[in-house]
Each structure stands twice: as C-alpha cells, then as structure tokens.
Regions:
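Short proline/glycine-enriched turn/loop segments at secondary-structure junctions
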Residues: 20-22, 112, 235-240
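Entry/capping segment at the start of metal-dependent catalytic domains
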Residues: 2-17
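A conserved mid-domain beta-alpha-beta active-site/ligand-binding segment of alpha/beta enzyme cores
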Residues: 173, 177-178, 182-183, 187
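Active-site segment of metal-dependent pyrophosphate-handling enzymes
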Residues: 50-54, 83-87, 91-152, 159, ...
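N-terminal strand-loop-strand
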Residues: 13, 17, 21-70
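Conserved Nudix-box catalytic region and its N-terminal flanking loop in Nudix hydrolases
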Residues: 48-97, 184-207, 211
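Long, intrinsically disordered, low-complexity Ser/Thr/Pro-rich regulatory/activation regions
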Residues: 230-252
Length: 252
C-alpha cells in the first residue's frame, strides 16, 4: 500500500490543512547579559578608586531552580522578534531608555538546559552606563562584580560571593561567552565607552580595559590602543593622595 501525496492548488489551501502538532514545538527565551562598570572606593587614600566590571543578576524566588541567580530574561512572544524581546526585558529590568548597546550573543540549545521543557535561549549582550539606569526595584536584582580567570567565574557583591553552581540553568556559560566576546572586541572597537561615564581619566579607562581583558597593560601600549578613541577635555579631577588628572571623553 502506498501513501498518496495530496496535491494542493494554492498556498492558502496548504496552510489551512497544515497540522503543526505533527512536530515538537520547543520554547524560545531571550536572556540578556547586562554588563557595566562602576567605582569601588579605594581602601588606601593614596590610591585612585578601583574600577569594577559588573553583571546584573536576578534572584529566583520560585521553581525551577529556586534560590539561584539568573540573567534577566523571559519567553519570546509569538509576535516578537528575539531583539524586540531583549529590548523589552532590558527596559523592564533596568528602566534604561535611549540608545543602548545591544548585540545578539549566541543561541544556547543544549537539550537538557531547562528542566521544564525543551527551551532554546537566544542570548543578547547589553553594555550600559549605570548612570542611565532607573531601576524600579520590582525584582530582587543586584549587580555583581566579575572575577574571571583561567575559565573560572566568581561573582561578588557586598553581601555574597557566587560560584558557577549558584547560577541557574546554563547562565554561567552565557556570562563567560559574553566576557570572551567582549575581550575579543574591546581592543579594535569602541564599545567599552557604552559602559563608561561621559568623562573619565585615562587611569580609570585603563583599569576598565584591564579588568575586562584579565591582564595588565603596559601604559604605552594602552595609550596606543586608545589614541584615536578619546580626546581631552578642559577639566581636571582632583583626589586625595594623587595629582589632579585630565578628564577625557570619547572621540566622536
């Protein structure tokens, strides 16, 4: 006995007869990796404040994986693009408006990455100046400074230190993928300035490069890297224990 293939006379006839239930329908989420930088007050008054490279995490109050921390995210609506969903999540979680740097990072699709069902995550990376944020406090979200060396990730804030095991799903992998992407782009693009205040010293900027790259930079090499990216202002910053420094801004 042979199966006879039905011949349709039009696209609309085919679509009307199409049975989507014949195939599995995995869910798709958008998870947004939000990076920023901030100051940590120096313990030694002779030293400049330390720059921190940070990520925003949300505490999970419900199952699955209750008690862990995850990146801001959610399911993509049926009428949304992945990018639209990422912007929606970014606005809802941070209150950020205006021109925010956001790029698609990677699609995470391990079959067992979510215990509920088959879920793909289209992850995006956002770079934000914290001064532009107007966080509403409706979720238990906190900034954690990033320590990433030799493939090992630790996250710190004033109350907690998180290991990879404290992060929900595969979000440790998403964070590490984002760090590697940023490391690969920081020296030949100007995306670092999306996390910086409008004015900064060269010392502050060098610290940001170093904490993202995970290595020290020779001052002369650093200045070559940023030579065409910044311009001096006519302002100075004074601080206890060190000489006033010229403030720079991004070269437009």
């Amino acid at each position: 006995m042979t199966n006879t293939k039905h011949e349709f006379s039009s696209e609309s006839e085919f679509l009307a007869a199409y049975d989507a239930s014949q195939f599995d329908r995995p869910s798709v989420t958008s998870d947004v990796l939000i990076f920023s930088v901030s100051n940590s007050v120096a313990e030694n008054w002779r030293k400049a404040d330390k720059q921190l490279f940070s990520v925003l995490l949300v505490h999970r109050d419900d199952y699955p994986q209750k008690g862990k921390w995850n990146l801001p995210g959610g399911f993509i609506g049926i009428d949304e693009t992945a990018l639209d969903a990422a912007y929606r999540i970014l606005r809802n979680e941070t209150g950020a408006t205006g021109n925010i740097y956001l790029e698609q990072l990677y699609t995470f699709d391990a079959p067992n990455r979510d215990p509920r069902t088959r879920v793909f995550s289209i992850a995006h990376m956002a770079l934000i100046n914290k001064n532009k944020l107007h966080y509403s406090g409706k979720h238990d979200a906190k900034w954690f400074s990033i320590e990433y060396n030799n493939g090992k990730l630790l996250l710190h804030n004033e109350d907690l230190t998180l290991t990879e095991a404290d992060l929900a799903f595969d979000h440790a992998m998403i964070i590490k993928t984002g760090i590697e992407r940023l490391r690969n782009k920081i020296e030949y693009t100007d995306i670092v300035f999306d996390m910086m205040p409008s004015e900064f010293t060269l010392g502050e900027l060098q610290q940001v490069y170093e904490i993202i790259l995970g290595r020290k930079m020779i001052p002369a090499a650093f200045r070559r890297t940023i030579a065409n990216k910044v311009v001096p202002t006519d302002k100075m910053r004074s601080g206890s224990g060190h000489r006033p420094s010229v403030l720079f801004k991004k070269h437009c």
